[in-house]
Regions:
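Bacterial N-terminal signal peptides that target proteins for export
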Residues: 1-12
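Hydrophobic alpha-helical segments of integral membrane proteins
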Residues: 16-17
């Protein structure tokens, strides 16, 4: 895929990149692309069930749809709903798991706090989705959560942290866009690059359906292998964790040291990480984009195929 200097052609991507505290893995286009790829790999029975459940239990119109509601595709529309409700429902921790940089592979439960984490949230929502006696609206919400959280899980910065709120406190100059402080946050920041800027620049203006087709063709030879690997959610987290170390943080100039693992509620907490890193003038230009884009492409494609695997498995006995 060519990576010329084409800037963000979608309003969603532009807004998310410069929204100071955005933590919305993959942004609108990325999440919708994951859903559209998944849709291609659902069994006929699962696809029919998903479409029927979502159609019969539409999103409550009271919710402000950040990415905009769409009637083009029910799964694509469902993919971003969890970000619309996270503030009011106060379930932000469901979207990520903070495994500190430098951690050794092992059980993930110690990193899942009292408010939950993405792996636990997927497991809990699958229980609801599989329950044939559960209320249809509850099952539809569970489905929307699962569609979104599997996408979140494949954004590397939703699987790790460096005492920096998953990269939100890492100011980065992206091509000609210099990092600036906004209250207690920074933009562009490392998290926003991976949510929107990197995949949007890579997509070169393609809409989610076009991007899904491109990635589907690009990884056609790999998909069967991914499917044969089976469902291993914890392994997928560690994949993202390793990619965060080798590419997300590892390809930045200058390098960012591993920080002591301390709780950070804002970028100006006691560790003052945002201001310290701002003075390092961290940059991500063409070289970084060339390293990062293939990783983002593969994670979005894997996320779609694996989401289909989870739904096919869950709905096989739930209908």
């Amino acid at each position: 895929m060519k990576r010329f200097a084409v800037y963000w052609r979608s309003l969603c991507g532009l807004l998310l990149l410069f929204w100071p505290s955005a933590t919305l893995a993959w942004g609108c286009k990325g999440h919708q692309t994951v859903a559209l790829i998944a849709e291609k790999h659902l069994t006929a029975e699962a696809k029919q069930f998903v479409e029927k459940l979502l159609a019969e239990n539409p999103v409550d119109p009271k919710w402000n749809r950040y990415c905009g509601g769409t009637s083009r595709d029910l799964m694509a529309d469902a993919s971003t709903w969890a970000d619309d409700v996270r503030g009011e429902r106060k379930n932000g921790p469901w979207h990520y798991i903070d495994v500190p940089r430098g951690s050794q592979h092992g059980p993930l439960e110690p990193y899942c706090g009292p408010q939950g984490c993405v792996t636990r949230a997927i497991s809990e929502q699958l229980v609801i989705l599989k329950d044939g006696k559960a209320d249809g609206a509850k099952r539809a919400e569970a489905l929307r959560y699962i569609i979104h959280f599997v996408g979140d899980l494949h954004q590397p910065l939703h699987t790790t942290t460096n005492a920096d709120q998953g990269g939100n406190c890492v100011p980065v100059k992206y091509f000609r866009r210099s990092a600036r402080q906004h209250n207690r946050s920074y933009s562009p920041n490392l998290h926003s690059l991976w949510d929107t800027a990197i995949p949007d620049r890579d997509a070169e203006g393609a809409d989610p359906a076009e991007y899904a087709e491109t990635l589907e063709a690009q990884f056609a030879a790999d998909i069967e292998g991914w499917q044969k690997e089976g469902i291993h959610v914890d392994r997928w987290v560690w994949e993202g964790f390793d990619l965060a170390e080798s590419v997300v943080y590892g390809a930045l100039t200058p390098k960012i040291a591993v920080e002591p693992n301390v709780p950070v509620d804002s970028c100006s907490d006691d560790n003052n990480i945002g201001e310290r890193l701002l003075h390092q003038n961290i940059t991500a230009g063409e070289t970084y984009q060339d390293r990062a884009a293939p990783v983002a492409e593969k994670r979005i494609a894997e996320g779609g195929v694996r989401l289909a695997m989870i739904l096919n498995d869950a709905l096989r006995a739930a209908q």
